[in-house]
Amino acid sequence: MHETPEDMERLQALLDRSIERAGAFLRSSFEMPERSLSAGQLVRYLQGNQTVAFATVTAKGEPRVAPIGSLFFRGRFYIPTVATAARTRMITARPAVSLTHFAGIDLAIIVHGNATTIPADHADFASLEAMQRAASGSSVQDWGEGVYLRVEADTLVTFARYPEQFPA
Protein backbone atom coordinates (compact mmCIF):
# COMPACT_ATOMS: atom_id res chain seq x y z
CA MET A 1 0.00 0.00 0.00
CA HIS A 2 1.28 3.43 -0.95
CA GLU A 3 -1.45 5.47 0.71
CA THR A 4 -0.60 7.94 3.46
CA PRO A 5 -2.94 8.53 6.41
CA GLU A 6 -4.05 11.74 4.66
CA ASP A 7 -4.78 9.79 1.45
CA MET A 8 -6.90 7.34 3.43
CA GLU A 9 -8.83 10.16 5.13
CA ARG A 10 -9.46 11.86 1.77
CA LEU A 11 -10.59 8.58 0.20
CA GLN A 12 -12.95 7.75 3.08
CA ALA A 13 -14.41 11.27 2.95
CA LEU A 14 -15.03 10.82 -0.80
CA LEU A 15 -16.74 7.47 -0.21
CA ASP A 16 -18.91 8.97 2.54
CA ARG A 17 -19.85 12.02 0.42
CA SER A 18 -20.68 9.77 -2.51
CA ILE A 19 -23.09 7.73 -0.39
CA GLU A 20 -24.71 10.91 0.96
CA ARG A 21 -25.19 12.35 -2.56
CA ALA A 22 -26.42 9.11 -4.13
CA GLY A 23 -30.05 9.01 -5.17
CA ALA A 24 -32.60 6.95 -3.29
CA PHE A 25 -32.69 4.20 -5.93
CA LEU A 26 -28.89 3.76 -6.00
CA ARG A 27 -28.68 3.77 -2.20
CA SER A 28 -31.43 1.14 -2.09
CA SER A 29 -30.14 -1.10 -4.89
CA PHE A 30 -26.54 -0.96 -3.61
CA GLU A 31 -27.77 -1.31 -0.01
CA MET A 32 -25.66 1.66 1.05
CA PRO A 33 -23.85 1.92 3.38
CA GLU A 34 -24.20 -1.67 4.65
CA ARG A 35 -22.72 -3.20 1.48
CA SER A 36 -20.24 -0.40 0.75
CA LEU A 37 -16.50 -0.87 1.11
CA SER A 38 -14.40 1.33 3.39
CA ALA A 39 -11.28 3.13 2.19
CA GLY A 40 -9.14 0.42 3.81
CA GLN A 41 -11.05 -2.39 2.11
CA LEU A 42 -10.91 -0.63 -1.25
CA VAL A 43 -7.17 0.05 -1.10
CA ARG A 44 -6.37 -3.52 -0.10
CA TYR A 45 -8.58 -4.95 -2.87
CA LEU A 46 -7.22 -2.70 -5.62
CA GLN A 47 -3.58 -3.78 -5.29
CA GLY A 48 -1.88 -4.55 -8.60
CA ASN A 49 -3.34 -4.08 -12.05
CA GLN A 50 -7.16 -4.10 -12.18
CA THR A 51 -9.20 -4.12 -15.38
CA VAL A 52 -11.79 -1.35 -15.59
CA ALA A 53 -14.28 -0.18 -18.18
CA PHE A 54 -13.01 3.35 -18.88
CA ALA A 55 -15.31 5.89 -20.54
CA THR A 56 -14.39 9.15 -22.29
CA VAL A 57 -16.30 11.56 -24.55
CA THR A 58 -15.57 12.38 -28.22
CA ALA A 59 -15.67 15.86 -29.75
CA LYS A 60 -19.19 15.03 -30.97
CA GLY A 61 -20.27 14.25 -27.41
CA GLU A 62 -20.39 10.52 -28.05
CA PRO A 63 -19.33 8.16 -25.25
CA ARG A 64 -16.42 5.78 -25.77
CA VAL A 65 -15.75 2.93 -23.38
CA ALA A 66 -13.01 0.32 -23.41
CA PRO A 67 -11.60 -2.27 -21.02
CA ILE A 68 -8.16 -1.25 -19.83
CA GLY A 69 -5.76 -2.00 -17.00
CA SER A 70 -5.58 0.47 -14.14
CA LEU A 71 -3.48 1.11 -11.06
CA PHE A 72 -4.74 2.45 -7.73
CA PHE A 73 -2.10 4.69 -6.15
CA ARG A 74 -2.51 7.02 -3.18
CA GLY A 75 -6.28 6.74 -3.37
CA ARG A 76 -6.68 7.49 -7.09
CA PHE A 77 -7.07 5.46 -10.26
CA TYR A 78 -4.37 5.75 -12.93
CA ILE A 79 -4.68 4.48 -16.50
CA PRO A 80 -1.39 3.55 -18.24
CA THR A 81 -1.42 4.67 -21.88
CA VAL A 82 0.47 6.78 -24.43
CA ALA A 83 0.26 10.49 -25.18
CA THR A 84 -0.86 9.81 -28.76
CA ALA A 85 -3.81 7.54 -27.84
CA ALA A 86 -7.30 8.73 -28.77
CA ARG A 87 -8.37 8.55 -25.11
CA THR A 88 -5.52 10.87 -24.11
CA ARG A 89 -6.50 13.40 -26.77
CA MET A 90 -10.15 13.20 -25.68
CA ILE A 91 -9.22 13.81 -22.05
CA THR A 92 -7.05 16.78 -22.93
CA ALA A 93 -10.06 18.43 -24.58
CA ARG A 94 -12.85 16.97 -22.41
CA PRO A 95 -11.61 15.69 -19.05
CA ALA A 96 -14.88 14.16 -17.80
CA VAL A 97 -14.54 10.37 -17.40
CA SER A 98 -16.18 7.40 -15.74
CA LEU A 99 -14.79 4.00 -14.88
CA THR A 100 -16.18 0.82 -13.44
CA HIS A 101 -14.54 -2.29 -12.05
CA PHE A 102 -16.82 -5.21 -11.34
CA ALA A 103 -16.76 -8.90 -10.54
CA GLY A 104 -20.00 -10.44 -11.74
CA ILE A 105 -22.91 -9.33 -9.59
CA ASP A 106 -20.97 -9.47 -6.32
CA LEU A 107 -18.74 -6.39 -6.59
CA ALA A 108 -18.92 -2.99 -8.26
CA ILE A 109 -16.66 0.04 -7.99
CA ILE A 110 -17.99 3.03 -9.94
CA VAL A 111 -16.12 6.32 -10.39
CA HIS A 112 -17.10 9.61 -12.05
CA GLY A 113 -14.70 12.54 -12.25
CA ASN A 114 -12.08 14.26 -14.37
CA ALA A 115 -8.80 12.94 -15.72
CA THR A 116 -5.47 14.65 -16.22
CA THR A 117 -2.32 13.47 -17.98
CA ILE A 118 0.71 12.53 -15.87
CA PRO A 119 3.85 12.82 -18.06
CA ALA A 120 7.27 11.27 -17.41
CA ASP A 121 8.55 14.38 -15.59
CA HIS A 122 5.75 14.28 -12.97
CA ALA A 123 6.77 13.50 -9.37
CA ASP A 124 4.54 10.38 -9.23
CA PHE A 125 5.64 8.93 -12.57
CA ALA A 126 8.53 6.78 -11.24
CA SER A 127 6.31 5.23 -8.55
CA LEU A 128 3.60 4.50 -11.12
CA GLU A 129 6.16 2.94 -13.46
CA ALA A 130 7.42 0.68 -10.66
CA MET A 131 3.86 -0.43 -9.91
CA GLN A 132 3.11 -0.98 -13.60
CA ARG A 133 6.27 -3.02 -14.11
CA ALA A 134 5.56 -5.13 -11.00
CA ALA A 135 1.95 -5.74 -12.05
CA SER A 136 2.43 -6.42 -15.76
CA GLY A 137 6.12 -6.75 -16.50
CA SER A 138 6.00 -3.76 -18.84
CA SER A 139 6.44 -0.01 -18.66
CA VAL A 140 4.43 2.67 -20.42
CA GLN A 141 7.74 4.02 -21.66
CA ASP A 142 8.20 0.73 -23.54
CA TRP A 143 5.16 1.73 -25.62
CA GLY A 144 6.56 5.06 -26.83
CA GLU A 145 5.57 8.36 -25.25
CA GLY A 146 4.06 6.73 -22.18
CA VAL A 147 1.84 8.67 -19.80
CA TYR A 148 -0.66 7.92 -17.07
CA LEU A 149 -4.16 9.32 -16.84
CA ARG A 150 -5.01 10.25 -13.25
CA VAL A 151 -8.70 10.18 -12.38
CA GLU A 152 -9.75 12.78 -9.80
CA ALA A 153 -13.02 11.31 -8.57
CA ASP A 154 -16.04 13.46 -7.76
CA THR A 155 -18.03 10.31 -7.01
CA LEU A 156 -16.85 6.86 -5.93
CA VAL A 157 -19.45 4.29 -4.96
CA THR A 158 -18.94 0.65 -4.15
CA PHE A 159 -21.08 -2.43 -3.73
CA ALA A 160 -19.91 -5.69 -2.21
CA ARG A 161 -22.47 -8.45 -1.79
CA TYR A 162 -20.25 -9.86 0.97
CA PRO A 163 -18.28 -6.89 2.37
CA GLU A 164 -16.98 -9.02 5.24
CA GLN A 165 -14.87 -10.91 2.67
CA PHE A 166 -12.81 -7.76 2.03
CA PRO A 167 -10.26 -7.18 4.80
CA ALA A 168 -9.42 -3.59 5.68
Feature names for model-found ranges:
Residues A24-V52:
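Short, basic/aromatic recognition patches
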